[in-house]
């Protein structure tokens, strides 16, 4: 049986990786996935004018599963208030259902 969850997604500049990871850890979230990503937005046009996934200029995408929407919104608010006036980024929340995940669901499973 699936366990309901909230998937918080944060896409921003790679330079913020450690700072955002610290906010997520401090929130009590059980973990996250982070990956390099690229794309184009109002503040994400690289010098070539093309979407970019190079290591130097790459963006990152965090995916965080939370049990409550409140926790997801708390993380989102802290990140946006602290960094998004000076750095490019977008944050969104999706409903999710966890099918398997020892840390999220416990030893008995979901």
Swiss-Prot record:
Protein's membrane topology: Peripheral membrane protein
InterPro entries assigned to the protein according to its UniProt record, in alphabetical order: N-reg_PII, N-reg_PII-like_a/b, N-reg_PII/ATP_PRibTrfase_C
GO cellular component labels: plasma membrane-derived thylakoid membrane
Keyword terms of this UniProt record: Cell membrane, Membrane, Thylakoid
Gene Ontology terms describing biological process: regulation of nitrogen utilization
Location relative to the cell: Cellular thylakoid membrane; Cell membrane
Domain of life: Bacteria
SUPFAM superfamilies with a match to the protein in the record: GlnB-like
Entry annotated with the keyword Thylakoid: yes
Pfam family name, one: P-II
Molecular-function annotations in GO: enzyme regulator activity
Inducing factors: By limited inorganic carbon availability.
Protein name as it appears in the record: Membrane-associated protein slr1513
């Amino acid at each position: 049986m699936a366990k309901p969850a909230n998937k918080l997604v944060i896409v921003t500049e790679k330079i913020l990786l450690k700072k955002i990871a610290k906010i997520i850890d401090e929130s009590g979230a059980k973990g996250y996935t982070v990956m390099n990503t690229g794309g184009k937005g109002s503040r994400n046009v690289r010098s070539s004018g093309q979407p970019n996934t190079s290591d130097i200029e790459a963006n990152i995408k965090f995916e965080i599963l939370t049990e409550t929407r409140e926790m997801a919104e708390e993380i989102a608010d802290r990140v946006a208030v602290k960094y998004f006036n000076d750095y490019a980024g977008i944050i969104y929340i999706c409903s999710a259902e966890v099918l398997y995940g020892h840390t999220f669901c416990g030893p008995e499973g979901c």
